[in-house]
Swiss-Prot record:
Protein's name according to its UniProt entry: Inositol 3-kinase
PROSITE patterns referenced in this protein's UniProt entry, alphabetically: PFKB_KINASES_2
Lineage: Eukaryota, Viridiplantae, Streptophyta, Embryophyta, Tracheophyta
Entry EC number(s): 2.7.1.64
This protein's UniProt keywords: ATP-binding, Kinase, Nucleotide-binding, Transferase
Amino acid sequence: MTLNPPPSQQTSHSPRRIPNRRVLIVGNYCHDVLIQNGSVVAETLGGAASFISNVLDSSSVSCDLVSKVGHDFRYEVTHSPIVAPEKETTVFEAYFDLGIDGIGHADRVLKRVSACDPILPSDIPDSRFDFGMAVGVGGEILPETLEKMVEICDVVAVDIQALIRVFDPVDGAVKLVDLKESGFYHILHRIGFLKASSDEALFMDVEQMKHLCCVVVTNGEKGCRIYHKDDEMTVPPFLAKQVDPTGAGDSFLGGLIVGLVEGLTVPDAALLGNLFGSITVEHIGQPKFDLMMLQKVKDEVQRRKKQCNISSSHNNDHNEFHERLSPARFSCVDSQLQPKLLVNGHSCDDRSL
Protein backbone atom coordinates (compact mmCIF):
# COMPACT_ATOMS: atom_id res chain seq x y z
CA MET A 1 0.00 0.00 0.00
CA THR A 2 1.66 3.24 -1.10
CA LEU A 3 -1.19 5.74 -1.04
CA ASN A 4 0.42 8.84 -2.48
CA PRO A 5 -1.15 12.26 -1.79
CA PRO A 6 -4.12 13.17 -3.99
CA PRO A 7 -2.97 14.98 -7.12
CA SER A 8 -3.16 18.71 -7.57
CA GLN A 9 -6.49 20.00 -8.85
CA GLN A 10 -4.66 22.04 -11.51
CA THR A 11 -4.88 20.87 -15.11
CA SER A 12 -2.61 21.41 -18.09
CA HIS A 13 -4.92 24.26 -19.08
CA SER A 14 -4.64 26.03 -15.73
CA PRO A 15 -3.12 29.52 -15.86
CA ARG A 16 0.55 29.92 -14.98
CA ARG A 17 1.08 31.00 -11.40
CA ILE A 18 3.87 31.75 -8.97
CA PRO A 19 5.19 28.80 -6.93
CA ASN A 20 2.98 27.76 -4.03
CA ARG A 21 3.67 28.60 -0.47
CA ARG A 22 3.67 25.27 1.26
CA VAL A 23 0.97 25.00 3.91
CA LEU A 24 -2.03 27.07 5.03
CA ILE A 25 -3.33 26.39 8.56
CA VAL A 26 -6.80 27.68 9.47
CA GLY A 27 -8.11 27.53 13.03
CA ASN A 28 -8.27 29.71 16.13
CA TYR A 29 -5.75 29.84 18.91
CA CYS A 30 -7.27 29.02 22.29
CA HIS A 31 -6.56 29.31 25.99
CA ASP A 32 -6.68 25.83 27.54
CA VAL A 33 -7.41 25.38 31.24
CA LEU A 34 -6.74 21.91 32.70
CA ILE A 35 -8.72 21.13 35.85
CA GLN A 36 -8.44 18.20 38.25
CA ASN A 37 -10.17 17.66 41.59
CA GLY A 38 -11.65 21.13 41.33
CA SER A 39 -8.27 22.84 40.97
CA VAL A 40 -6.57 24.37 37.96
CA VAL A 41 -3.39 22.39 37.31
CA ALA A 42 -2.28 24.14 34.13
CA GLU A 43 -3.17 26.97 31.76
CA THR A 44 -1.60 26.83 28.32
CA LEU A 45 -1.81 28.02 24.74
CA GLY A 46 -4.17 25.69 22.91
CA GLY A 47 -6.04 25.17 19.69
CA ALA A 48 -5.15 22.66 16.99
CA ALA A 49 -3.52 25.41 14.95
CA SER A 50 -0.97 26.08 17.70
CA PHE A 51 0.08 22.43 18.01
CA ILE A 52 0.23 21.93 14.24
CA SER A 53 2.26 25.08 13.57
CA ASN A 54 4.65 23.98 16.32
CA VAL A 55 5.29 20.72 14.47
CA LEU A 56 5.65 22.40 11.07
CA ASP A 57 7.91 25.18 12.36
CA SER A 58 10.09 22.67 14.21
CA SER A 59 10.34 20.63 11.01
CA SER A 60 11.29 23.68 8.89
CA VAL A 61 8.13 23.46 6.80
CA SER A 62 6.92 26.86 5.63
CA CYS A 63 3.37 27.68 6.69
CA ASP A 64 0.89 30.54 6.92
CA LEU A 65 -1.65 30.57 9.74
CA VAL A 66 -5.05 32.25 9.91
CA SER A 67 -6.38 32.47 13.45
CA LYS A 68 -8.57 34.86 15.43
CA VAL A 69 -8.15 35.84 19.06
CA GLY A 70 -9.69 38.35 21.42
CA HIS A 71 -8.30 41.48 23.04
CA ASP A 72 -7.15 39.38 26.01
CA PHE A 73 -4.70 37.18 24.06
CA ARG A 74 -1.29 37.34 25.75
CA TYR A 75 0.72 34.47 24.30
CA GLU A 76 3.86 35.04 22.24
CA VAL A 77 3.42 33.14 18.98
CA THR A 78 5.43 32.86 15.78
CA HIS A 79 2.38 33.36 13.57
CA SER A 80 0.46 36.49 14.54
CA PRO A 81 -3.34 36.09 14.76
CA ILE A 82 -6.12 38.44 13.72
CA VAL A 83 -7.31 40.32 16.81
CA ALA A 84 -11.06 40.83 17.26
CA PRO A 85 -11.01 43.79 19.70
CA GLU A 86 -14.59 43.35 20.88
CA LYS A 87 -14.19 39.63 21.59
CA GLU A 88 -12.43 37.39 24.06
CA THR A 89 -10.12 34.57 23.04
CA THR A 90 -11.69 31.12 22.78
CA VAL A 91 -11.30 29.28 26.10
CA PHE A 92 -11.65 25.56 26.75
CA GLU A 93 -11.75 23.92 30.15
CA ALA A 94 -10.72 20.26 30.31
CA TYR A 95 -11.91 18.34 33.38
CA PHE A 96 -10.00 15.15 34.10
CA ASP A 97 -12.12 13.83 36.97
CA LEU A 98 -15.77 14.10 35.93
CA GLY A 99 -16.36 10.41 35.35
CA ILE A 100 -16.66 8.12 32.38
CA ASP A 101 -17.76 9.37 29.00
CA GLY A 102 -20.79 8.18 27.09
CA ILE A 103 -19.05 5.27 25.42
CA GLY A 104 -17.46 3.86 28.56
CA HIS A 105 -13.99 5.42 28.38
CA ALA A 106 -12.24 7.15 31.24
CA ASP A 107 -11.51 10.47 29.58
CA ARG A 108 -11.55 14.22 29.96
CA VAL A 109 -14.70 16.29 29.77
CA LEU A 110 -14.24 19.32 27.53
CA LYS A 111 -16.18 22.59 27.78
CA ARG A 112 -15.98 25.70 25.64
CA VAL A 113 -16.50 28.62 28.01
CA SER A 114 -15.93 31.45 25.52
CA ALA A 115 -15.64 31.71 21.75
CA CYS A 116 -13.95 34.22 19.50
CA ASP A 117 -15.22 35.19 16.05
CA PRO A 118 -15.42 32.65 13.22
CA ILE A 119 -12.88 32.71 10.40
CA LEU A 120 -14.49 34.11 7.25
CA PRO A 121 -13.57 33.48 3.60
CA SER A 122 -12.36 37.08 3.43
CA ASP A 123 -9.83 36.29 6.17
CA ILE A 124 -8.19 33.65 3.96
CA PRO A 125 -5.39 34.87 1.65
CA ASP A 126 -5.87 34.61 -2.09
CA SER A 127 -2.47 32.97 -2.62
CA ARG A 128 -2.22 29.33 -3.64
CA PHE A 129 -0.89 26.65 -1.32
CA ASP A 130 0.26 23.06 -1.69
CA PHE A 131 -1.66 21.96 1.41
CA GLY A 132 -4.47 23.50 3.41
CA MET A 133 -5.42 22.41 6.92
CA ALA A 134 -8.92 23.11 8.29
CA VAL A 135 -8.39 22.58 12.01
CA GLY A 136 -10.96 24.53 13.98
CA VAL A 137 -11.78 23.47 17.52
CA GLY A 138 -14.50 25.86 18.64
CA GLY A 139 -16.83 26.05 15.65
CA GLU A 140 -14.83 28.82 13.99
CA ILE A 141 -14.63 27.27 10.52
CA LEU A 142 -17.68 27.89 8.34
CA PRO A 143 -18.70 25.85 5.28
CA GLU A 144 -17.95 28.82 3.03
CA THR A 145 -14.50 29.10 4.62
CA LEU A 146 -13.74 25.48 3.81
CA GLU A 147 -14.98 26.08 0.26
CA LYS A 148 -12.49 28.94 -0.08
CA MET A 149 -9.72 26.65 1.14
CA VAL A 150 -10.40 23.94 -1.43
CA GLU A 151 -10.33 26.60 -4.14
CA ILE A 152 -6.86 27.90 -3.26
CA CYS A 153 -5.14 24.74 -1.94
CA ASP A 154 -4.04 21.80 -4.06
CA VAL A 155 -4.85 19.37 -1.24
CA VAL A 156 -6.91 20.08 1.89
CA ALA A 157 -6.69 18.06 5.10
CA VAL A 158 -9.60 18.44 7.52
CA ASP A 159 -9.83 17.49 11.17
CA ILE A 160 -13.36 16.21 11.69
CA GLN A 161 -13.60 18.07 15.02
CA ALA A 162 -13.75 21.29 13.00
CA LEU A 163 -16.96 20.00 11.39
CA ILE A 164 -18.96 18.00 13.93
CA ARG A 165 -18.48 19.75 17.26
CA VAL A 166 -21.45 21.52 18.82
CA PHE A 167 -21.59 23.17 22.21
CA ASP A 168 -24.15 22.98 25.01
CA PRO A 169 -25.83 26.40 25.28
CA VAL A 170 -25.76 26.24 29.09
CA ASP A 171 -22.31 24.99 30.11
CA GLY A 172 -20.48 24.78 26.78
CA ALA A 173 -19.92 21.02 26.98
CA VAL A 174 -18.60 19.66 23.70
CA LYS A 175 -20.93 17.31 21.86
CA LEU A 176 -20.68 15.70 18.43
CA VAL A 177 -23.17 15.46 15.57
CA ASP A 178 -23.21 13.11 12.61
CA LEU A 179 -21.01 14.29 9.76
CA LYS A 180 -23.92 14.26 7.32
CA GLU A 181 -25.75 16.72 9.58
CA SER A 182 -22.79 19.06 10.02
CA GLY A 183 -23.44 21.36 7.06
CA PHE A 184 -20.09 20.44 5.48
CA TYR A 185 -20.89 17.13 3.84
CA HIS A 186 -21.45 18.58 0.36
CA ILE A 187 -17.85 19.84 0.28
CA LEU A 188 -16.05 16.70 1.39
CA HIS A 189 -15.66 15.14 -2.05
CA ARG A 190 -13.26 18.01 -2.78
CA ILE A 191 -10.88 17.46 0.14
CA GLY A 192 -7.86 15.17 0.22
CA PHE A 193 -7.78 13.93 3.81
CA LEU A 194 -10.20 13.61 6.71
CA LYS A 195 -8.68 12.88 10.12
CA ALA A 196 -10.73 11.62 13.08
CA SER A 197 -10.12 9.95 16.41
CA SER A 198 -11.62 6.50 16.91
CA ASP A 199 -14.40 8.09 19.00
CA GLU A 200 -15.12 10.77 16.39
CA ALA A 201 -15.15 8.15 13.62
CA LEU A 202 -18.39 6.80 15.11
CA PHE A 203 -20.07 9.93 13.77
CA MET A 204 -19.36 9.20 10.12
CA ASP A 205 -19.70 6.34 7.68
CA VAL A 206 -16.06 5.42 7.11
CA GLU A 207 -16.95 2.96 4.35
CA GLN A 208 -18.66 5.74 2.44
CA MET A 209 -16.17 8.49 3.22
CA LYS A 210 -13.15 6.47 2.09
CA HIS A 211 -14.46 6.69 -1.47
CA LEU A 212 -14.60 10.49 -1.25
CA CYS A 213 -11.18 11.11 0.31
CA CYS A 214 -8.41 9.47 2.31
CA VAL A 215 -9.66 8.85 5.86
CA VAL A 216 -7.18 8.57 8.74
CA VAL A 217 -8.50 7.33 12.10
CA THR A 218 -6.22 7.71 15.12
CA ASN A 219 -6.56 5.26 17.99
CA GLY A 220 -4.05 6.17 20.69
CA GLU A 221 -2.02 3.18 21.81
CA LYS A 222 -3.06 1.22 18.71
CA GLY A 223 -1.60 3.72 16.25
CA CYS A 224 -3.81 4.78 13.36
CA ARG A 225 -5.65 3.26 10.43
CA ILE A 226 -5.80 4.58 6.88
CA TYR A 227 -8.78 4.05 4.59
CA HIS A 228 -8.77 4.99 0.92
CA LYS A 229 -11.07 3.45 -1.67
CA ASP A 230 -10.41 -0.31 -1.43
CA ASP A 231 -7.18 -0.03 0.58
CA GLU A 232 -6.85 -0.19 4.36
CA MET A 233 -3.71 -0.19 6.48
CA THR A 234 -2.78 0.04 10.15
CA VAL A 235 0.19 2.26 10.99
CA PRO A 236 1.99 1.18 14.19
CA PRO A 237 2.34 3.38 17.29
CA PHE A 238 5.28 4.58 19.34
CA LEU A 239 5.45 3.88 23.06
CA ALA A 240 4.70 6.97 25.16
CA LYS A 241 4.28 7.91 28.82
CA GLN A 242 1.08 9.91 28.65
CA VAL A 243 0.83 13.03 30.78
CA ASP A 244 -1.83 15.03 28.93
CA PRO A 245 -3.60 13.89 25.73
CA THR A 246 -4.41 17.46 24.68
CA GLY A 247 -2.97 18.23 21.26
CA ALA A 248 -1.82 14.71 20.43
CA GLY A 249 -4.17 14.37 17.46
CA ASP A 250 -3.21 17.85 16.28
CA SER A 251 0.50 17.04 16.41
CA PHE A 252 -0.28 13.80 14.58
CA LEU A 253 -1.92 15.74 11.76
CA GLY A 254 0.99 18.17 11.68
CA GLY A 255 3.43 15.28 11.36
CA LEU A 256 1.32 13.72 8.62
CA ILE A 257 1.46 16.92 6.59
CA VAL A 258 5.21 17.29 7.20
CA GLY A 259 5.65 13.83 5.74
CA LEU A 260 3.50 14.61 2.71
CA VAL A 261 5.37 17.87 2.09
CA GLU A 262 8.61 15.88 2.19
CA GLY A 263 7.22 13.52 -0.44
CA LEU A 264 6.59 10.46 1.71
CA THR A 265 3.76 8.05 0.96
CA VAL A 266 0.67 8.42 3.12
CA PRO A 267 1.48 5.44 5.41
CA ASP A 268 5.02 6.72 5.98
CA ALA A 269 3.71 10.23 6.60
CA ALA A 270 1.18 8.83 9.09
CA LEU A 271 4.02 7.07 10.91
CA LEU A 272 5.70 10.45 11.25
CA GLY A 273 2.40 11.74 12.62
CA ASN A 274 2.34 8.97 15.22
CA LEU A 275 5.83 9.96 16.29
CA PHE A 276 4.96 13.63 16.88
CA GLY A 277 1.72 12.68 18.61
CA SER A 278 3.55 10.34 20.98
CA ILE A 279 5.92 13.12 22.04
CA THR A 280 3.07 15.58 22.58
CA VAL A 281 1.20 13.40 25.09
CA GLU A 282 4.27 13.44 27.31
CA HIS A 283 3.89 17.18 27.91
CA ILE A 284 1.34 19.59 29.31
CA GLY A 285 0.78 22.21 26.65
CA GLN A 286 3.08 22.78 23.71
CA PRO A 287 5.98 20.31 23.50
CA LYS A 288 9.47 21.58 22.80
CA PHE A 289 10.96 19.13 20.34
CA ASP A 290 14.57 18.22 20.96
CA LEU A 291 16.85 19.54 18.20
CA MET A 292 18.89 16.34 18.07
CA MET A 293 15.71 14.30 17.71
CA LEU A 294 14.44 16.57 14.93
CA GLN A 295 17.69 16.23 13.00
CA LYS A 296 17.66 12.44 13.33
CA VAL A 297 14.07 12.34 12.11
CA LYS A 298 14.95 14.55 9.12
CA ASP A 299 17.87 12.26 8.29
CA GLU A 300 15.65 9.17 8.44
CA VAL A 301 13.00 10.85 6.27
CA GLN A 302 15.61 11.65 3.61
CA ARG A 303 16.98 8.13 3.84
CA ARG A 304 13.49 6.70 3.42
CA LYS A 305 12.82 8.85 0.35
CA LYS A 306 16.04 7.73 -1.33
CA GLN A 307 15.30 4.12 -0.45
CA CYS A 308 11.83 4.27 -2.02
CA ASN A 309 13.12 6.10 -5.10
CA ILE A 310 15.68 3.39 -5.74
CA SER A 311 13.23 0.50 -5.44
CA SER A 312 9.45 0.52 -5.28
CA SER A 313 9.62 -2.71 -3.24
CA HIS A 314 10.72 -0.61 -0.26
CA ASN A 315 7.39 1.25 -0.28
CA ASN A 316 5.76 -1.61 1.58
CA ASP A 317 8.66 -2.15 4.01
CA HIS A 318 6.94 -0.03 6.63
CA ASN A 319 8.30 -1.82 9.68
CA GLU A 320 11.88 -0.91 8.82
CA PHE A 321 11.01 2.81 8.74
CA HIS A 322 9.32 2.44 12.13
CA GLU A 323 12.36 0.65 13.56
CA ARG A 324 14.69 3.38 12.33
CA LEU A 325 12.49 6.19 13.65
CA SER A 326 12.17 4.66 17.12
CA PRO A 327 15.76 5.43 18.25
CA ALA A 328 15.34 8.99 16.98
CA ARG A 329 12.06 9.26 18.88
CA PHE A 330 13.67 8.26 22.17
CA SER A 331 16.72 10.47 21.75
CA CYS A 332 14.56 13.42 22.83
CA VAL A 333 14.66 14.76 26.37
CA ASP A 334 12.76 12.52 28.78
CA SER A 335 9.61 14.16 30.13
CA GLN A 336 9.52 12.36 33.49
CA LEU A 337 9.57 15.65 35.40
CA GLN A 338 6.25 16.67 33.88
CA PRO A 339 3.41 16.48 36.42
CA LYS A 340 0.98 13.69 35.65
CA LEU A 341 -2.70 14.25 35.04
CA LEU A 342 -4.90 11.48 36.40
CA VAL A 343 -7.98 10.35 34.50
CA ASN A 344 -10.60 9.05 36.94
CA GLY A 345 -7.83 8.64 39.49
CA HIS A 346 -5.59 6.56 37.23
CA SER A 347 -2.26 7.53 35.72
CA CYS A 348 -2.01 7.20 31.95
CA ASP A 349 1.60 5.99 31.76
CA ASP A 350 2.99 3.67 29.12
CA ARG A 351 0.47 4.27 26.38
CA SER A 352 1.37 4.34 22.74
CA LEU A 353 0.46 6.59 19.85
